């Protein structure tokens, strides 16, 4: 299951992670975000040993989304070795996201 990450825990959970990290930036009021949630949960289970999957509520945590230029949600961002590798904006299908993750880790 995808865990939550906050502005305060981001450095430890994401930038210092030994595994690549997928961060789903979302908000309660965002319908496409709610549609993406079950897909993110499935990816979290399917790729558990390869990728850490985290979710960040942008309304509760405005600092990190601002730092990384999040302007639309849902946005998923992939980090590896403490660096941002790639970003996808909008609602995507599970297979498309898994292929994208595998190509970037």
Curated annotation (Swiss-Prot):
Keywords: Disulfide bond, Electron transport, Redox-active center, Transport
Pfam families reported in the protein's UniProt record: Thioredoxin (PF00085)
CDD domains: TRX_family
InterPro entries: Thioredoxin (IPR005746), Thioredoxin-like_sf (IPR036249), Thioredoxin_domain (IPR013766)
Function: Component of the thioredoxin-thioredoxin reductase system. Participates in various redox reactions through the reversible oxidation of its active center dithiol to a disulfide and catalyzes dithiol-disulfide exchange reactions.
Family per record: Belongs to the thioredoxin family.
Name of the featured protein: Thioredoxin
Organism listed in the record: Rickettsia bellii (strain RML369-C)
This protein's encoding gene: trxA
